[in-house]
């Protein structure tokens, strides 16, 4: 039973670490998306900024902003799906009550 408990704890720790990594990526994604939106807003306000950022944005996003948004939506759906899977697995692990056999009372 102790080995099963250690394996469950190890799996729980791995899942928790994966959750933290996904959460970090999601935060970065939102930061990048906000910066791109800011650049687009600034570009719309000033013709000079428009010319300067046009080439930068084209180099970064050759498929255009619409293509980036489509890819971002796909990625976001994947992340949400992974979060849901992670949540289900964590609930399963939490539902498993660890059973320890008291020392000296083993079956033979």
Curated annotation (Swiss-Prot):
The phenotype of cells or organisms lacking this gene is: Mutant is severely attenuated in virulence.
Source organism, top-level taxon: Bacteria
GO cellular component: a single term: cytoplasm
Q: Write out the coiled-coil annotation as residue ranges.
A: 69-97
Expression induction: Expression is regulated by the two-component regulatory system SsrA/SsrB. Expressed when residing in the host ileal loop, host macrophages, and when in an acidic environment. Repressed by methyl-3,4-dephostatin.
Keywords, in A-Z order? Chaperone, Coiled coil, Cytoplasm, Virulence
Compartments (UniProt record): Cytoplasm
Write out the function statement from the record. Answer: Functions as a type III secretion system (T3SS) chaperone, which is required for SseB and SseD accumulation and secretion. May have a direct role in secretion of SseB and SseD, or may facilitate their correct folding, for efficient secretion and function. Required for survival and replication within epithelial cells and macrophages.
Its quaternary organisation is: Binds to SseB and SseD.
This protein's domain notes: The N-terminal region is dispensable for binding and stabilizing SseB, but is essential for export of SseB to the surface of the bacterium.
Q: What is this protein called?
A: Type III secretion system chaperone SseA
């Amino acid at each position: 039973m102790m080995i099963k408990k250690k394996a469950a704890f190890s799996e729980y720790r791995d899942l928790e670490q994966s959750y933290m990594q996904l959460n970090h990526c999601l935060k970065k994604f939102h930061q990048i998306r906000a910066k791109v939106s800011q650049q687009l807003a600034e570009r719309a306000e000033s013709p000079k900024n428009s010319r300067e950022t046009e080439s930068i944005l084209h180099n970064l996003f050759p498929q255009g902003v619409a293509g980036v948004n489509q890819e971002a939506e796909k990625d976001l759906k994947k992340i949400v799906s992974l979060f849901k899977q992670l949540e289900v697995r964590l609930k399963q692990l939490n539902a498993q009550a660890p059973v320890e056999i008291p020392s000296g009372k083993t079956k033979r």
